[in-house]
């Protein structure tokens, strides 16, 4: 979308002051710990781009607050590279750079904000190559330290800590399907047919590049088969998000030109787990 179209969408430039005012009206406040997802084009013409958005968020949450984003790794080996011909695998293993929390780019599919935030002075990024998060603020280290190698969306993950800290989730123009926190609900849900993946990626151990095997829910293709519950072409998290809003959970407002939502992290996880267990059927043990 060209500049004029964006300017018309937002009725002029969206400034740091305007964003901070709109975020405050939505309910974000001083001391909040918030994971945010942003679709920049939905916000309109943001004067200054990602730095303006981050600046406005920091203005609102203040020195006691913390910002968190999901990063991933843009150049991570694909899960299925171990199915390649052996010579191709060997070539990749020999020279593929190790994941480095400081140097490795955030997944471009997550938009511009994660990369902008993780580069900020004082930002901290978790150690997991496939499921890394970055945070900036008072609770940044507490959120990201010692990210579990296996089950990185489950207990003691940055997502679990966000919930435990009374954190929040902001969708700044991003669709409901962007609710990454629902992967934590998938990890916790006691429902049949849960799907897992095992994959290998290179990490740094005492300064040396080492290939390590990881185990996680299938966050790429879905931890469950939602096909009987979700219309074709629609993401399961979008449907869960709509049902959550219909139940009166979260706040909705306009930030810049963007339709935006603010949720309590615990509400998202509690609703997501209950939805999955009800719709997919609770797992039954022997004799259950």
From Swiss-Prot:
InterPro entries: Amioglycoside_AcTrfase, Antibiotic_NAT-like. It catalyses: a 2-deoxystreptamine antibiotic + acetyl-CoA = an N(3)-acetyl-2-deoxystreptamine antibiotic + CoA + H(+). Signal peptide: none annotated. It comes from the Bacteria. Belongs to the antibiotic N-acetyltransferase family. Its EC number is 2.3.1.81. One of its GO terms (biological process) is response to antibiotic. It holds the Pfam family Antibiotic_NAT. SUPFAM superfamilies: TTHA0583/YokD-like. Resistance to paromomycin. This is Aminoglycoside N(3)-acetyltransferase VII. The lineage of its organism: Bacteria, Bacillati, Actinomycetota, Actinomycetes, Kitasatosporales. GO terms for molecular function: aminoglycoside 3-N-acetyltransferase activity. Keywords: Acyltransferase, Antibiotic resistance, Transferase.
